[in-house]
Amino acid sequence: MSFKVGFCVSGKGRLAMSAIRNAQRIGIKPCILIAEHTADQLLESFCCENEVNFVRIPKLPRVDFDQKLYESCTKQVLDLVCLTFDKIVAPRLVEYYKGRIINVHPALLPAFIGTKALERAESTGVRFAGATIHEVVEEVDAGAIVAQCLVSLGYMEKYNSFGSKIYKHLEPMFLQTLNWYATGRVFKDEKGRIWVRNAVYGGIPISPEIEIKFPE
């Protein structure tokens, strides 16, 4: 496995850990997990057990944080950087990994750009919610969409409930997306939209459709 991937995490790191556990199956080599100070304390031991480099960035002034993140990412020779990050990434890092950095956003972009997307979805009374994996560009949550998943909301359903429903689709979608990148199937058309070569589009709840079967 020569497709080298780095992960930047602010919370529990469930998606990153799942990718590391399934690395051989999806054809990636996890190289580094960079954790914000808010990230789960168990991530370091998990990375140690799985022979993945680990860096925790303490609470720092913004300029110092950006510098530490940049140094930690660029020190590695990475093919792809995956963000499940609460912070906006500095333009210098976005430029360095242009076209090779993706983000997981808990909403159906271009709706609910920015923070607290699930809470805002609940407050507006939408009937459907979901998650988006997209390319990272300097403008927040404005990069080309790679994949999306969709769930319907029940009567008076709270965001923590439909957030759990979303995650059931988000995890396999995330793993499959890494596999698409690793196998060189992701490309851009003349309008700058991202597509996956030979993938099946138009289905629900995930588009493009998942090709690898992952255990529940």
Question: Which residue ranges define each predicted feature?
Answer:
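Short, well-structured alpha-helical segments in soluble
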Residues: Q67-V77
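N-terminal Rossmann-like dinucleotide-binding module
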Residues: M1-Q41
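Small/polar loops that bind or transfer phosphate-bearing groups
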Residues: F7-G11, A35, I57-P58, V81-F85
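Donor/substrate-binding cores of folate-linked one-carbon enzymes
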Residues: E36, C82-Y201, P205-K213
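Short amphipathic alpha-helical segments
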Residues: A19-R21, S45-C47, L93-Y96, T115
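Short, surface-exposed acidic-centric catalytic microdomains
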Residues: I26-K68
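A general structural signal for well-ordered alpha-helical segments in protein cores
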Residues: A16, L43-E44, D66, L118, ...
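Hydrophobic beta-strand scaffold residues
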Residues: P30, N53-V55, L80, I101, ...
